[in-house]
Amino acid sequence: MPARRSAARIDFAGSPRPTLGVEWEFALVDSQTRDLSNEATAVIAEIGENPRVHKELLRNTVEIVSGICECTAEAMQDLRDTLGPARQIVRDRGMELFCAGTHPFARWSAQKLTDAPRYAELIKRTQWWGRQMLIWGVHVHVGIRSAHKVMPIMTSLLNYYPHLLALSASSPWWGGEDTGYASNRAMMFQQLPTAGLPFHFQRWAEFEGFVYDQKKTGIIDHMDEIRWDIRPSPHLGTLEVRICDGVSNLRELGALVALTHCLIVDLDRRLDAGETLPTMPPWHVQENKWRAARYGLDAVIILDADSNERLVTDDLADVLTRLEPVAKSLNCADELAAVSDIYRDGASYQRQLRVAQQHDGDLRAVVDALVAELVI
């Protein structure tokens, strides 16, 4: 057993402060057809060497990332600084930047894979499901001071999974069809064998043992092949939240980043105060994910281990009030307050459905509306 523990050891870098980082995935769409364009390689080459711009699985996708930031406003400005020049290059090539959880009508069979061994290996292993991953999301990293805090925070954060998914849900379409889901992306992504909800661990050693087993049995070769909706990033010293669908605009992105930041820091501080963080049974967490994906802001979610239920927007109102002091301390009070605008004015999936109805089902109009929302 000691030898196994030594082999399983994973060092967590740790962050002295609850710093913030954001990864924002964009699709490239043709300005005329509004369909996806497999031109990311050329776009990234023209942008040149830039640590803020990354390639992704498919050649229709460009990822914009922030640096290490102290607050939401800093992260949003960092993203803006990269987005402006990048969008100009994209437009000069007859395309637009588009972000939602899925594209309204694009076909997966027309998409090209980025030339990289890890992507080729992913498709070789996952086959049909892997080729279906025509999805885009937002990932938020929050710094955690030490490894022993990561698992309790991650497991407790799952209580807020439906809140984040319902607010960000932006993928009602799949291949031109209305799926009836607010977030079809959430249902698609979990089909990959190492994706979906994380296991409920309380100790870092449990996670180390899990990774050891995954590697020994050939399920993964590297840590980044664990594609959970929330996962540790040991080399960065962060907890990475990957729940949210793609977000079309900076205002909503700022609201969701601020909410994520506040939730994690609140749990972190409660741990410091000696509190045992609340958790729910895995079956409740799984049900909440499905309800939020299916019903979005109309979801009635399970609140606790006692199976109490409540409309997600009603619970969000109380969560936002409770987090106000945390937001002030993190300099994101305005961004957190903007969360309520999302459920008051309508989430992306609701806006998309409304646009489609107003244009007699023409999904090109949905693409145009989402592109127009990206005000830099």
From Swiss-Prot:
Gene3D superfamilies: 3.30.590.20. GO terms for biological process: modified amino acid biosynthetic process. InterPro entries: GCL_type2/YbdK_subfam (IPR050141), GCS2 (IPR006336), Gln_synth/guanido_kin_cat_dom (IPR014746), YbdK (IPR011793). The keyword ATP-binding applies. SUPFAM superfamilies: Glutamine synthetase/guanido kinase (SSF55931). It holds the Pfam family GCS2. Keywords: ATP-binding, Ligase, Nucleotide-binding. Its EC number is 6.3.2.2. It catalyses: L-cysteine + L-glutamate + ATP = gamma-L-glutamyl-L-cysteine + ADP + phosphate + H(+). GO terms for molecular function: ATP binding; glutamate-cysteine ligase activity; ligase activity, forming carbon-nitrogen bonds. The keyword DNA-binding does not apply. Disulfide bonds: none annotated. ATP-dependent carboxylate-amine ligase which exhibits weak glutamate--cysteine ligase activity. Belongs to the glutamate--cysteine ligase type 2 family. YbdK subfamily. This is Putative glutamate--cysteine ligase 2.
